[in-house]
């Protein structure tokens, strides 16, 4: 429908062929929706014009992150009619720290929160200061306390290096204290005497006995002592992988592998000769050959499965 056909359409405006534009003389009390120049039509709205004007997105972005000075983006004078008296009091409380030297970005973020998210039930310290986590306000600290424990636990968990010491049971702490007392000697005894109880001495003695029992004996044979030490180290540090204990030296393994290459099964004479040459017992040579045969069997089985699964190889 062209523009020149809209004129006679005002009398029968409810017909389907009409575009619902009305002219000024028919309805003189209403503002004209279609002026003479269609390209420049001022749209009038039914609501009042005293609502706060919405700022563009760039201004809101700059104000939220305080990229430019706060005074440029906060028209404080003409927004007073939008908020209740309680929120105005909170805004006055916010303006006081700015005179005391609060950084501009903190003030900008807090004032933006006050202007854009009015809540009647907020308290005055909700937006004024930043909370313990450094990002959210102080009112969110209660959620951090319930999620991560009490404030004391929060303060202690800031340093992960001390977690193992704090998580340790009191028995381990008493054991370490008893070991320190055994190392110092007389001062620890005098302090336990000044504690004034035979129970303290008995506890320290029991802890010292437990510590002594936990230490590996160094008087055993080299092979067993090295194995026990490695087991202890692997048990104490769960992260560290336990080093494999091998009772044979590289020279012994090389000679045994050479003999195994010539014959998988070894007779008694050859076994005695090898044990004398390699400074091993007859039983050690026998067990090594048994283990080596089992290893060879497993290698052959894996090789067979690999080549049967890949027929092109």
UniProtKB/Swiss-Prot annotation:
Coiled coil: none annotated. Pfam families: DUF3528 (PF12045), Homeodomain (PF00046). Keywords: Developmental protein, DNA-binding, Homeobox, Nucleus, Transcription, Transcription regulation. Residues 154-246 are annotated as: Disordered. Sequence-specific transcription factor which is part of a developmental regulatory system that provides cells with specific positional identities on the anterior-posterior axis. Belongs to the Abd-B homeobox family. It is linked to Radioulnar synostosis with amegakaryocytic thrombocytopenia 1: The syndrome consists of an unusual association of bone marrow failure and skeletal defects. Patients have the same skeletal defects, the proximal fusion of the radius and ulna, resulting in extremely limited pronation and supination of the forearm. Some patients have also symptomatic thrombocytopenia, with bruising and bleeding problems since birth, necessitating correction by bone marrow or umbilical-cord stem-cell transplantation. This is Homeobox protein Hox-A11. The gene is HOXA11.
